[in-house]
Every structure is written in structure tokens, then in C-alpha cells.
Amino acid sequence: MDIQSVLQKGEGISAEFKRAESKVPDNLFETVCAFLNRNGGIILLGVTDSGKVEGIKAGMVEKFCKEISNLSNNPQKLNPTFLLEPAVIDFRRKKLISVYVPVSSQVHRCAGKIFDRSVDGDYEVRSDDQIRNMYSRKSAYYSE
């Protein structure tokens, strides 16, 4: 993966940047859930929304990777679970974490809520029609 091109393109339907200087972002799994439910994507931790590379505090990178892997396997956080494998990237003498999230054949929930991805944001899916449409989209896509 070419980090420079991801940064140049900016956030979009399949790319999300999150600051993570001293902790894993609270809304990380909303994005994971939205990517699983839509087209998949890449999350870069240590980058601002505008694409500025800030990096992650020294000594926190391995802790964050373990936390992300553990939470992705926790049905209270992400259901059904989907084990993520964060990757550490050295970029411009700063540490980033890259989380690749593929599209999933299932509809996922984050803390009991369904999220979808649109343009460059994660949105909670609340209406019965939207939820039905998501299940139909997944069913049609994975049964062909």
C-alpha cells in the first residue's frame, strides 16, 4: 500500500484518518463497522482529518495494535466479530498504524448499532428500510 497516495487522495468512502497520539480513538470501531458493511477501506491512525501526519506516541504503538486486535474479537464491541490485523508503518520518521478492513458478507454492529459509510463519514443506520436494504445488498452481492 502506498501511504503517500492514500494521504494525497484524502478521506473518502474507503479511507479514514484518525488522530491517535496517546489513545485509540473512541469512534474507531464505528468506522470499522461502516467499512465492513459497505466496501471496505483503510484506516490510518496517527493522521489528522486533513491528512497531516502527526504520528503516534512512542511506546504506544504495540499497545494500540493489541487493543485493536482484542476489541475486534470482542462481540460487545463488534458483532459479529472480525479479527483485524493492524500494521505498523514508519512514515516520515513517524509511526502510524494502518488497519485494512475488507468488505464483509455479513451485517456488523458496533456496540449494538449498525453503521454504514458514505462519502467520508460513518452514519448510524436506524430505519428498518435502510437495515433491510443493507441485508438485501449483502445477500445479492454474496449470492451471485
Short names for language-model regions:
Residues M1-E144:
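Conserved N-terminal catalytic/coupling substructures associated with nucleotide/phosphate chemistry
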